[in-house]
A protein has these predicted regions:
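Low-complexity, glycine/serine/threonine/alanine-rich intrinsically disordered linker
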Residues: 28-50, 68-75, 79-84, 88-821
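Bacterial N-terminal signal peptides
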Residues: 10-21
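Bacterial Sec-dependent signal peptides at the C-terminal "C-region" and cleavage site
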Residues: 19-29
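N-terminal secretory signal peptides that target proteins for export/translocation
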Residues: 1-8
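Residue-level detector of conserved, well-ordered beta-strand and adjacent loop positions
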Residues: 58-61, 86
């Protein structure tokens, strides 16, 4: 060491001067405790000469105002703390030296992070994201107006689309907000007398046949019995379109009942029950909405599983826009099996009738109209047409406007309206009146101004502890993705919401509401990336059994599983492994589990030898962590490290090419990665990435269990796998799957079951990850260094209950992370 001193002295002195010149207020002299560790174990590789990994510790300053600088210091701390640095082949630092240096650095990072939070808050001044904006208008005005497509998509950070630091505001946003507010206000304004709620039953074969006559005639037929038989729903959106019906009152809710069944035709007729040969699988009936054009894609899909044993009645409820109608189509019928005589083809969906009820409403005028115009009378614009173009009428326009605006602004701004608020919006109302606008038009202009103002678009939070109104907004956005309701605002007015017992009770109330489903969807969309379930389309040759209904069932499975964990306060161990799954018949069939019938999800005990259980073996998770053609242990490994363990890997170097899958089956992904890992620059990261990815290799891109890879043959005739009931050949069985691997710490596993056990040995890591993901979603800010202490406290506090999910949620909401800006 003495012999090295002259060579090391210049950089040691530079390091000392640099550290001393950037002292934190945390604990004077804390950097002196880093110098011995850096000098003895770090500078050999990380000085100005070597600079391995691009890191020069000899010139690295301390700058609390620079987020990138603090992230780099945090990375240094984590690498040393996790014993990844120094490298395994290097001498280990003495325990007391390592402990002292880490304690000093951890304290400095915590102090400066906490000071920033006290000064500026954890969450930057943020706006409502797209879903929050749409839900808020829907709940405020009571109209399910189609606004989602009007607004730009939100960027994400840490997987979530409500993170304030990522939510920009552009001129496009402002233009779209004006359009959306105008559309929502007009839709909420009543202009007709109460519509008649009617129930109509239509002969489906007649209405459908008239609309689709001469189109895709090999896809459908009207049987001699008068039923409509549909053979293939995949050729175009007009298959099954109820073309003779349109909503008598657009943009209201309607309930559709469809009587249908799966059936087999025999010699041009529907086979009698005694002659029915049961189809090898049920047919899925899809109900959706579509526009008048045959090119209109259906949306708002709902699926029902039809049995061949008897007719069933299937219900679908939706808000129907103008120019839209019902769309019915069967799934799981092979389109390539079509023949010129459809009634001789066999398996089909038979529709007897469709019943339509609506419009459905609780009161008239609806609640949204009453919020805007109170109990003002509706009078016709033209007395000669007493039931057309009704308008709210006021004898005292100024007084009524002031009364109505105060109530509206209090709901829209999520706090009582100030006198300045009232003055600004009344001024616009009076200006519109002077310009000759009608009362309702003038009032809507003021409402539109409110819905495009910062008080509506942005969260009103100040550094420090949130006031009760800000707390009400944060709680409702967290669990409902919407504005607080009247009860939350009433408690905020009383100053009672911030009391721990009241806050807990309100958390329970919000979770019990149907609107809490938004929490399930948005949280899982960010945490597990389920919002990207549609981003890939599995290759139809390799995965011909994949279909929209299977995908919807996968998504519903994960959502129902999360809701079960939350409702029953089950342990976060279930994230990795559970002894049950939420299944319907289609999913059970896909997973190879017997005894499940029907399209409704229910809790199903898993067989002892099942490889399923937990989020990581669910179809939706396995689909979003793969592309449409192949699985990648690297991609899935990164997914598990980030989403399940909370240790996201660093992004790959820009000069490292991605691996292209060999869909011909000549080379396995393990063989490709072995060559890739032999490169020194790649080995370190892959030691962490590859094990969890290979543990999941027995699951293909659609979540099916496999023991071999599917491959596409050079010649189609060489394919050995057929679609049932057809002559279509798709793929061959390729090389065998090998899911075994060894973790970076030396622990080995043979398959997913063994890997799960290794993860379950450290449930506190699973809990910590869930707490960090919850805090990001609930507050709109990704984890910061000062949050680590709070997260550790929450994990410790919930350990006696085995880290129950509901306990974790309550603990986050009652913590400084949630209660402070």
């Amino acid at each position: 060491m003495i012999r090295r001193l002259p060579r090391l002295a210049p950089r040691w002195l530079a390091l000392a001067l640099l550290l001393l010149g950037s002292e934190s207020a945390a604990a004077p002299g804390w950097r002196a405790r880093l110098e011995p560790l850096f000098e003895a174990h770090c500078l050999t590789c990380h000085d100005a000469d070597e600079k391995k990994g691009g890191l020069d510790l000899a010139s690295l300053a301390w700058n609390p105002a620079d987020a990138g600088n603090q992230q780099l210091w945090t990375k240094i701390l984590d690498l040393v703390e996790q014993d990844e640095m120094p490298p395994k082949r290097k001498p280990r630092p003495p325990a007391d030296l390592r402990h002292g240096a880490l304690t000093a650095l951890r304290g400095a990072l915590h102090h400066d992070s906490l000071e920033r939070q006290k000064r500026d808050g954890r969450v930057v001044f943020r706006r409502l994201n797209r879903a929050e904006y749409v839900n808020t208008l829907h709940d405020l005005l009571g109209k399910d107006t189609a606004l989602q497509g009007l607004l730009p998509q939100d960027p994400t950070a840490g997987g979530f689309d409500n993170i304030g630091a990522a939510l920009n505001l552009s001129t496009e946003h402002l233009e779209r907000y004006l359009q959306a507010a105008d559309s929502a206000l007009k839709a909420a304004t009543v202009t007709t007398p109460p519509p008649t709620r009617a129930k109509t039953r239509l002969d489906y074969s007649e209405t459908w046949h008239d609309w689709n006559h001469g189109f895709q005639t090999t896809s459908w037929a009207v049987s001699p019995e008068g039923f409509l038989a549909i053979y293939w729903g995949g050729g175009g959106p007009s298959h099954g379109t109820l073309g003779a019906w349109s909503p008598p009152v657009p943009d209201e809710r309607y309930r559709f009942r469809v009587r249908a069944r799966a059936m087999i035709t025999k010699e041009g007729h529907l086979a009698k029950p005694a002659d029915q040969a049961r189809p090898d699988r049920n047919i899925i009936l899809k109900l959706a909405l579509t526009g008048e054009s045959r090119a209109s894609a259906p949306y708002g899909e709902a699926f029902h599983e039809m049995s061949p044993s008897e007719f069933g009645e299937f219900t679908y409820e939706a808000t129907v826009p103008e120019g839209h109608t019902l769309y019915v189509a069967p799934h799981r019928i092979v389109p390539a099996a079509a023949k010129e005589k459809p009634m001789e083809r066999g398996l089909c969906a038979v529709v007897e009738w469709v019943e339509i009820e609506g419009p459905l409403y609780e009161a008239w005028p609806p609640a949204g109209h009453r919020l805007l115009y109170g109990d003002l009378p509706l009078v016709p614009e033209n007395p000669a047409e007493p039931e057309k173009n009704l308008r709210p009428y006021s004898r005292q326009p100024d007084a009524d406007a002031a009364r109505l605006l105060r109530g509206f602004l209090g709901r829209a701004f999520r706090r009582p309206a100030t006198e300045q608020d009232m003055a600004e919006h009344l001024a616009l109302f009076r200006e519109q009146q002077r310009a000759g606008r009608r009362f309702d038009e003038s009032l809507r202009a003021s409402y539109k101004l409110a819905l495009c103002s910062p008080a509506f678009l942005f969260l009103q939070e100040k550094p420090g502890r949130l006031d009760d109104f800000a707390l009400a907004t944060r709680l409702s956005l967290a669990l409902w993705s919407s504005a607080p309701d009247e009860e939350l605002l009433r408690l905020a007015t009383q100053g009672a919401l911030s009391k721990p017992a009241t806050l807990r009770a309100q958390t329970e109330r919000l979770l019990a509401s149907p609107k809490a489903r938004r929490f399930t969807q948005t949280f899982l969309g960010g945490w597990l990336n389920l919002r990207e379930i549609d981003f890939t389309q599995p290759d139809t040759k390799l995965y011909p059994e994949f279909e929209p209904y299977l995908q919807q069932s996968m998504l519903r499975e994960s959502e129902a599983f999360f809701e079960t964990l939350l409702r029953d306060n089950l342990s976060v161990r279930n994230v990795v492994h559970s002894d049950f799954a939420m299944l319907n018949e289609r999913l059970a069939e896909h997973y190879g589990i017997t005894g499940v019938k029907g399209d409704h999800l229910r809790r199903v005990p898993l067989p002892a030898d099942s490889h399923r259980g937990g989020f990581i073996t669910q179809g939706a998770v396995l689909k979003v962590s793969a592309n449409g053609t192949s699985t990648s242990p690297v991609v899935r490994g990164a997914y598990v490290l980030d989403r399940i363990l909370g240790t996201p890997p660093a992004p790959p170097p820009k000069d490292v090419p991605s691996l292209e899958p060999d869909i011909r089956g000549a080379t396995t992904i393990r063989e490709q990665l072995t060559q890739h890992r032999d490169q020194p620059a790649c080995a370190g990261c892959h030691a962490k990435l590859d094990p969890p990815g290979f543990a999941l290799e027995n699951f293909d891109v659609i979540g099916r269990w496999r023991t071999s890879y599917r491959a596409i043959p050079e010649k189609a005739k060489d394919a050995i796998v057929k679609i049932p009931g057809t002559d279509i050949r798709h793929y061959i069985d390729g090389p065998a799957v090998d899911p075994s691997y060894t973790l970076a710490d030396g622990r080995a596993f043979r398959d997913i079951d063994g890997f799960k056990q290794l993860l379950l040995a450290h449930p506190e890591q699973l809990a910590r990850c869930v707490v960090e993901k919850l805090s990001a979603h609930l507050t709109g800010a990704t984890p910061q260094f000062a949050d680590r202490e709070v997260v550790t406290e929450i994990v410790a506090r919930t350990r006696p209950g085995d880290f129950g999910l509901r306990d974790l949620l309550h603990a986050v909401i009652q913590s400084r992370l949630f209660l402070h800006k």
